[in-house]
Amino acid sequence: PLCLCWALSPVAASAPPNLLFLLMDDMGWGDLGAFGEPSKETPNLDQMASEGMLFLDFYTANPLCSPSRAALLTGRLPVRNGFYTTNAHARNAYTPQDIVGGIPDSELLLPELLKKAGYTNKIIGKWHLGHRPQFHPLKHGFDEWFGSPNCHFGPFDNRALPNIPVYRDWEMIGRYYEDFKIDLKTGEANLTQIYLQEALDFISKQQASQQPFFLYWAIDATHAPVYASKRFLGTSQRGLYGDAVREIDDSIGKILNHLQKLGISENTFVFFTSDNGAALISAPKQGGSNGRFLCGKQTTFEGGMREPAIAWWPGHIPAGGVSHQLGNVMDLFSTGLSLAGLQPPSDRQIDGIDLLPAILQGKLIDRPIFYYRGNEMMAVRVGLYKAHYWTWSNSWEEYSKGIDFCPGQNVSGVTTHTQEEHTTLPLLFHLGRDPGEKYPLSFASDEYQRAMERISLVVQRHRATMVPGEPQLNVCDRAVMNWSPPGCEKLGKCLTPPKSDPKKCFWPH
């Protein structure tokens, strides 16, 4: 008989695996013992790394929360999927309560596509792709949701503005600080435990139903104001931030253990990473570590965009692997589709690549990393070389008020406080010799000339295919805040919105 095996990938030939993406919030490269954090307070994540594959060169698509999450779920750079602003040059923008925009219907999200392969999809935690009804995650491929549309950082003490709602599926079931308490004095909150239980219950339910699942566990305990439950408070050598990390580590250990107990660990692909670098401006009490890398969240230096990353899939990924593959959160889109036996959409530019050859066979795929800030490509990495076409940390005005994205790390001529253009002669670093981006190569050197010849071609090709999407993060209006989310009437928690008054959003950095 004729063999039809060629039509199927080795993965898709059997039942497609479950997908579990563990996305941290503002956790840095230097926060895990496996990446060299000296207090070694992440035993479960370190064990996950020893049983799976550690990625040393894994990046986010943007140094801020919302654009990074939009990139992960669409496989596309934020400048393509609309998660950027044109209100000013090279500005970070996200989805606060008063944002009018969100994820466009024209974008295809990973869970929408996974439905074609019979997956049930759940998001637990922070959505951050728009909070208005048309942007609801259940309208974009998810079947279940427990979590919040925005970050938990406020308003919490301002009676004139609504607190952020917490949803179960279509309707709100309460609000942060009112029904879901976060004690800002002690840092106590039970949210990570609630998110853990949600994950365990969903996994058990799906295992019983024999249907493949995609679980996107996007928790936010390490985003300021950081929090931990009572049992973990005061247990870390790293203060409250370390307490939050310890609780997350413990929770991930319980989730992986649950998969093993149910006998489905060999059929569940798990990937751990973070949405952007640690927020050094909040450190050390409310922020983490980016290890040896320069600066942090909000910047396109390595500390803002290089992330901790671990792939775990017992029986498939060889234990103890360390990969130097250049990876990006957008690759989770393409890799997830590949695992499900699906092709990425062919009617649009997809920036994510399928990492399975790197993960399962140790092959290195030649690909660049682009570092965007708002509407500007600030830098590009090709191989071990990184070229900065623009540099900026933040303005002198902000810096003089104590807003510092590179505390104790400022490098003259590199971490500039005015936007400096280097497009004629980019600043070039060899990240193997100089991971801290402190010593630019001499413009006159042969090494500079050779590297820039290669990089210039990559940038030229990239710019030729770059068609920016309609910017979603330009318009703000207090009338669209979470005044009366669906379900508020049942709880008696509806608030009256003010008159609509749309304005250009102000993005200072």
Regions found by a protein language model. Give the residues of each.
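Formylglycine-dependent sulfatase
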Residues: 1-426, 435-474, 478-509
